[in-house]
């Protein structure tokens, strides 16, 4: 599974400025999911790959970014 990291409180994606390989996104994906996850900056938000199927990613059901 893959997808954007989402903030559970706001419903917003984790933003990033440096597109492509991005240490911040790798770190956040691994903290949020697990150590074998990978991340990069895509469309100015952190995109995570190699996630488990039950991982919660953006968009959250019934919660819009404010």
Swiss-Prot record:
Q: Which compartment or compartments is the protein found in?
A: Secreted
Tissue expression summary: Expressed by the venom gland.
Which cysteines are cross-linked by disulfides? 12-65, 16-41, 25-46, 29-48
**Listed Pfam families:** Toxin_3
Disulfide bond as a keyword of this entry, yes or no, is yes
Q: Which domain of life is it from?
A: Eukaryota
Instruction: Name all LCN-type CS-alpha/beta domain ranges.
Output: 1-66
The job of this chain, per UniProt, is described as: Beta toxins bind voltage independently at site-4 of sodium channels (Nav) and shift the activation voltage toward more negative potentials, thereby affecting sodium channel activation CC and promoting spontaneous and repetitive firing.
Name of the protein:
Beta-toxin ChFII.9
Which lineage do the record's taxonomy fields give for this organism?
Answer: Eukaryota, Metazoa, Ecdysozoa, Arthropoda, Chelicerata
């Amino acid at each position: 599974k893959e997808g954007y990291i989402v903030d559970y409180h706001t419903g917003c994606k984790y933003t990033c400025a440096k597109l492509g390989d991005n240490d911040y996104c790798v770190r956040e994906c691994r903290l949020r999911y697990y150590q074998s996850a990978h991340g990069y900056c895509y469309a100015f938000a952190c995109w995570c790959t190699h996630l488990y199927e039950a991982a919660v990613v953006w968009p959250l059901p019934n919660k819009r970014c404010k």
